[in-house]
C-alpha cells in the first residue's frame, strides 16, 4: 500500500528473520518488493535470538555470524543473477546434496530481472555482528541503541569496512 501511495520514501523489512525463510525466498521477496516500490526497497535481515529460533522455528541457534554471512552471500548471488546459484557452506548447501537428497536438485538462476543492487541491512547488536555488517551489508538496523554511544557502533562498523570493498564511509552506511 505504501509503495503505491508514495514515490520518495524508502520501504523495507525492519528485520526479516533469517531462520524463518530460505535465502531464495528472501531474495525473491526483495526483488518483487523492489520492483513494486520503484526501486525503493531495503532488505532488512537478522537472526533473532535463541528463544525464537529454537522455540518457534525449531532450528539450533549456533554460529549466527556464519548464518548471516552465508545468507547475505546467497541473497546477493540470487539478486545479481550472474550465474546459477551454487553455494556449499557450513549452513547452506545449494543445490542440496546431503542426507535425504534425491540428487535431482540443479543450480538455478532467478527468472526475475530486478535491481542487482538492492540494499541489504542487518540487525546487529553485538560488536562482532556490527563489524560483520560493515563488511557485508549496506546498513545497520539497531533495535536497542544508546544515542550517547554512537562512536562504539561506528568503530565496530569501521572495522568491517576494512575487510570490505563495498563501503568506506560511515555517513552513508
Identify what each model region corresponds to.
Residues 1-173:
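Active-site-adjacent structural elements that line small-molecule/cofactor binding pockets in enzymes
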Amino acid at each position: 500500500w505504501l509503495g503505491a501511495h508514495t514515490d520518495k520514501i524508502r520501504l523495507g523489512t525492519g528485520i526479516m528473520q533469517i531462520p524463518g525463510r530460505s535465502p531464495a525466498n528472501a531474495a525473491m521477496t526483495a526483488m518483487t518488493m523492489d520492483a513494486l516500490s520503484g526501486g525503493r526497497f531495503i532488505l532488512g535481515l537478522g537472526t533473532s535470538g535463541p528463544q525464537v529460533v529454537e522455540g518457534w522455528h525449531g532450528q539450533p541457534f549456533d554460529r549466527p555470524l556464519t548464518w548471516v554471512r552465508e545468507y547475505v552471500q546467497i541473497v546477493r548471488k540470487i539478486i545479481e543473477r550472474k550465474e546459477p546459484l551454487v553455494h556449499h557452506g557450513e549452513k547452506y548447501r545449494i543445490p542440496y546434496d546431503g542426507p535425504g537428497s534425491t540428487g535431482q536438485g540443479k543450480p538455478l538462476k532467478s527468472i526475475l530481472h530486478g535491481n542487482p543492487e538492492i540494499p541489504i541491512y542487518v540487525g546487529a547488536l553485538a560488536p562482532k555482528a556490527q563489524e560483520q555488517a560493515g563488511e557485508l551489508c549496506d546498513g545497520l538496523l539497531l533495535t536497542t541503541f544508546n544515542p550517547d554511544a554512537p562512536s562504539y557502533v561506528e568503530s565496530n562498523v569501521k572495522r568491517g569496512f576494512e575487510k570490505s570493498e563495498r563501503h568506506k564511509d560511515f555517513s552513508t552506511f
